[in-house]
Structure formats: structure tokens, C-alpha cells
């Protein structure tokens, strides 16, 4: 079984994780889940198309790939369709979310969750104390 980790740009959704940090996160995930990483694939900076891994998949036939987060998946519809078409049979693991799965439905659900998260309103925690943030949370639950 061929398993690969994929590093991408430092900007991963709401996170900023340099490639060495991404490698540490994915290697830790692989170790905890008894996965043996056989390839490390760096994607180009400023790209979330995952084109390099798709190109290599044509020759290497990966069974599993590990990414840090669902936020590394493509956003543009044509890139999403290319990824699904080329890698629908591959098992995707997302280390930060702790989820894995394969197929069109799984990937589309991950992309939907990432999009929903990115549209969520953020609270400027520098303008509020922890007590104010806690009160805001409790008020929302009422």
C-alpha cells in the first residue's frame, strides 16, 4: 500500500502552518494510526489544486494520502471535479480533523464543511476579555 503525505502553502484556511510543521502533524497522525508513509509530496506555494499529487497518482497509484486539514482541498469547482475524478478511489486522511474516508460523497462533505467554516463570523478576541467571550457564548446558548 502506498501512502503519501502532502504539504501545501503555509496558509491553510484559518491556520498558518509552515511545511515543516505540516510534516510533523502528518507524521504524528500516521504514527498514531499505524500508517507507513512512503512518499512526501510538496505542492506548489499559493496553490490548493493538489495537481502534483494527482499527477504522481497516475504512476504511483496511491492507496492513502494524508493532509493536515480539509482546508487544503480545492475550492474552485473545476479543480474539485478533477480531484474527485482522478483520486476517487484513494483514502483521504485529515490529521487536524481526525477524519478519513474515500469517494465523491466524503470529499464533497469535507469541502462543504471547510467552506462553511470559512464563512463563519470571527470574534476579535483582542477586543474582549475571556469573561466577556464566555458570556457571549452563554448568551448564544440561551
Protein language model features and the residues they cover:
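Short, structured surface patches at the beginning of a domain
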Residues: 1-142
